[in-house]
């Protein structure tokens, strides 16, 4: 039985590696679709399921998707640097929620769930936003910031697990994996 991470995210791979898992990385070819409204948790789970649906045989495939939720609006990955800066302006001085959906495919079945973490960012100055966006770091991250990177200095409060914000809630993953692959 082989564990496969259906993601090109180096952050998800790093979390799995640090938790002691042996796995292959095979980014999913699943198309992401815009948030249709409704429950952000259901949306992240549906995207994670689409990513995990690929694979077969004796593989256990893990898919995940993360969004930032502010005042009921879902912030995915920014389209460009201007979009990333706009997201950071909206999040500045505010508390928001990060939702990560995880799905595991094994033996033709898909199990999924989600985890939520609340974060508060301090008020950000315009020059800080510009300098951070200029690093390029926020361009591939939901909400336009990387908690595990340069944006860590913006966070004043974290309620929940950091790995949910980084993109792979390990406690949830452990529950979803077949027993023979679970790590303590």
List the predicted regions and their residue ranges.
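Anionic-ligand binding patches
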Residues: 1-4, 37-184
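N-terminal beta1-alpha1 ligand-phosphate binding loop
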Residues: 1-21
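Cofactor-binding loop segments of dinucleotide-utilizing enzymes, especially the Rossmann-like FAD-
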Residues: 8, 28, 107
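Short loop/helix-cap segments at secondary-structure boundaries that form the rim of catalytic
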Residues: 14-18, 35, 55-57
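Short glycine-rich, Thr/Ser-proximal phosphate-binding strand/loop in the N-terminal lobe
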Residues: 20-37, 110-115
């Amino acid at each position: 039985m082989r564990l496969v991470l259906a993601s090109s995210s180096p952050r998800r791979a790093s979390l799995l590696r640090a938790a002691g898992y042996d796995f292959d990385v095979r980014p999913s070819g699943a198309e992401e679709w815009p948030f249709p409204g409704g429950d952000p948790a259901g949306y992240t789970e549906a995207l994670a399921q689409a990513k995990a649906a690929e694979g077969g045989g004796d593989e256990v495939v893990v898919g995940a998707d993360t969004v930032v939720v502010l005042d009921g609006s879902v912030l995915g990955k920014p389209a460009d640097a201007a979009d990333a800066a706009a997201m950071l302006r909206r999040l500045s001085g505010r508390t928001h929620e990060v939702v990560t959906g995880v799905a595991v495919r094994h033996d033709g079945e898909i199990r999924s769930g989600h985890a939520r973490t609340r974060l508060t960012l301090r008020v950000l100055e315009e020059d800080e936003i510009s300098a951070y966006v200029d690093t390029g770091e926020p361009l591939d991250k939901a909400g336009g910031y990387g908690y595990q990177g340069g944006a860590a200095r913006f966070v004043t409060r974290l309620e929940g697990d950091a790995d949910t914000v980084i993109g792979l809630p390990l406690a949830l993953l452990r529950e979803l994996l077949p027993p023979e692959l679970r790590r303590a």
